[in-house]
Structure formats: C-alpha cells, structure tokens
C-alpha cells in the first residue's frame, strides 16, 4: 500500500543527516518568509527561527493577544523540558501537510518543500495537523523503519506550534487559539506526569 511505502521512504529521507539545524538560505512557507540560518541545537533553531518570528507577527496582526502570546513564549523558554532526548538533524520536507502530497498510482510525490535540517518529529506532526489520509499506516511503517523516541506523540503539539502560528499570521481565524491550546497542552502534560 502507498501509505506504508511512503512511511518507509520518509524514514529513509529523515536518516540523511544535514550538517546543522537549519539551512544556508532563508526560504518561504506559503507566502511567509522562513528564516533558516543554522543553529547548533534543534531547540534553539525551533524557538528562534520557527516559533518566535511568527509569534511576534501573530500579535502584530491581531491573531493573538499579548497574554496568549506569553503562554507560547513561556513554552519556548522551557522547550528543553518538552523536546525529548536530542537527535541529530534530519533532512526535512519542512511543509509536509496533505496538500503537499500527490497520491499517484505507484507512489506519493511531494511538492512545495521547505527543506532544512530539523527534528524528524516535525514532519510527522505536520502530517497529523491537517488530516493526512491513512496517517496511522504511514506512522506505523515509519516507526518500523526508524523507531521514534518514547513520548513522541506527547510532543506533537510542540512541533505543531510553528505551522499553527504561520496560519495565524497568514489567515487569522482560530489558528492563534489553536497554537495557544497546543502550548498549554505541553504544560498540562508535564504536570500530569
């Protein structure tokens, strides 16, 4: 089945280890600029290149209040508490949602990448965000090929902060509230352990 084949292929793509977290050139995600300058750890890269620029823009555009933004900012200050064990950079698609997957007769083709070195859970969290068909089959095949760290499903919300904030900036609506809920869920999960 295509979903299993895709899960295995994605795991193999993620096994490619770029030199750093980030990329040498900045890019775009949709119409939004995407800062990519490399940083030594995923946590630094994700907080400063993915979440914080869009958090500021979401507040400036009225998609989040200052109080809501403070919850996400607090999560970024505590990102090491939520991020799991460190992993080497993985080669990511970077904008891997179902709309960038073209299901062919024999394989799934990916379009519109925002390629960079990142955390492999980021691509998987993006797949979960907007309803990828046969997602569980994709994830099972991925995990068989390249086992994920324990607790990765609890970190999905962390990895979804960036795309939710990008959508809050570009489209407004409920995306800002969803980003706040994702950040709050990190704190809720941490206190329930």
Where are these regions (language model features)?
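An acidic site on a long C-lobe helix of protein kinase domains
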Residues: 2, 157-160
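Hydrophobic packing residues in well-ordered alpha-helices of helical domains and bundles
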Residues: 3-6, 68, 72, 179
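A general structural signal marking secondary-structure boundaries and capping sites
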Residues: 14-21, 58, 83, 146, ...
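Active-site catalytic-loop/activation-segment of kinase and kinase-like phosphoryl-transfer enzymes
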Residues: 29-80
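Active-site Asp-x-Gly
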Residues: 42-47, 56, 88-91, 98-157, ...
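A mid-sequence, solvent-exposed acidic-amphipathic segment
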Residues: 65-106
């Amino acid at each position: 089945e295509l979903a299993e084949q895709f899960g295995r292929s994605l795991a193999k793509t993620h096994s490619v280890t770029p030199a750093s977290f980030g990329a040498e050139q900045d890019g775009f995600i949709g119409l939004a600029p995407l800062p990519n300058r490399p940083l030594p750890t995923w946590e630094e890269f994700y907080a400063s290149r993915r979440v914080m620029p869009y958090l500021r823009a979401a507040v400036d555009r009225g998609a989040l209040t200052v109080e809501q933004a403070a919850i996400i900012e607090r999560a970024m200050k505590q990102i090491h508490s939520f991020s799991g064990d460190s992993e080497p950079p993985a080669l990511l698609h970077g904008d891997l949602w179902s709309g960038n997957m073209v299901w062919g007769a024999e394989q799934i083709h990916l379009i519109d990448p925002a390629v960079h070195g990142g955390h492999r859970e980021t691509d998987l969290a993006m797949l979960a965000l907007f309803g990828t068909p046969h997602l569980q089959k994709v994830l099972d095949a991925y995990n068989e090929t390249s086992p994920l760290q324990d607790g990765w499903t609890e970190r999905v919300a962390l990895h979804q902060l960036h795309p939710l904030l990008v959508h809050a900036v570009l489209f407004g609506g409920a995306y800002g509230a969803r980003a706040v809920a994702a950040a709050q869920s990190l704190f809720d999960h941490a206190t329930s352990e």
